[in-house]
Amino acid sequence: MKIDLILPPTKRAGYGVLESFTRDLNSAFGQIGVESRILEPSSRLISTLIRDQPDYTLSFNGILPDPEGRWLCEMVDIPHIAYIVDSPNHFLELAKQSMNVIVTIDQGFAGLFERYGAERVCFLPHAVSREVTFTHEAHPEFGWVFFGTCFDVEAIEMQWQRDYSQRVQEVLHAAASLALEDPQIFYFDAFMRSAESHGLTPAELGNLSIPVLLQSLENKIRGEDRLFLLRNLEGIPVDVFGRSIHKRGWGELLRGSSVCVHDATDYSQVKSIIRRSKGVLNSTPSIRYGAHERIFEAMAAGVGVVTSESVFLRNEFGGENFYIYGDVSSPQRAFKAEEELGGDKKESRCRAVIKHHTWIKRAEQLVAFLRVDKK
């Protein structure tokens, strides 16, 4: 089997994470005997693929059609693997193309693509490099660290008031509350339940885009969850790294708290900071049936983890091997429980990550899926 990995366009590469994933997966393919190479998204891409055809192309977050509506997979007649590691709302158009194989990092995301018509969908959680080493430093350089975009909930709600009818606003507010109160409900399902209970009809939506509504809903959920966590630290010092998509950022929204706000940093620095920290705070309330790579990075390095609810993590690691701040009366108790977690348990979850959640494992799982899919 031969798979060509295509780097994302520069404007979508973010802080280097997609490029890093691409190189890690390419290395993993080589280690399991799959022929692969990395290609730039240049003007020569199509001719390169036609001249030396792989069995599949692969790109993190997929390749959408060009401005003229043409799909790369159709132009070169090669199936495309769209490995979605960000919110699915931006990429649901991929479900329309039958030559796309869609990989998602959350089972809820997979179900959403299937509802939009995708026929070939594979669930593979985030992963880490096998080279991550268990450090568990006695005197780490950083205390607790948090990485994440700042979402100003008030700004989101003001945009709803400006752009949506009262009924649509009520549906979105109710959906956000439902998704935050019941961590087993995926935000799309919360939206559908809320729309049904409020009697919202397709006619009332008019020309409103469902993916745009879902993205706005997800942003509100993420914003509320992150502010709940970071505003309830009660003196626990935390270094917060992240940009804002609104006028107000972390510095203004967390003024008076015990956090130290930093600019967003590139992915290589994120990994380095995690390994030099006491622990990682993780707020990903829209990933309920999967896991973010920050969690695996922290576990593999032997540092602490306090995270939002994840059914997947509970099933993988059990409730006594990491701590969820929604489980306890306050985030402080989750901090204390995680800091008191024994070194043997931290070593155990490190071994579990290295055994089950590396890029080599994901490469093996993806190849196994593709072989079954071809039959």
Regions found by a protein language model. Give the residues of each.
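Catalytic binding pocket for nucleotide-activated donors in carbohydrate/polymer assembly enzymes
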Residues: 4-16, 20-33, 37-41, 96, ...
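Structural motif
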Residues: 55-58, 79, 101, 279, ...
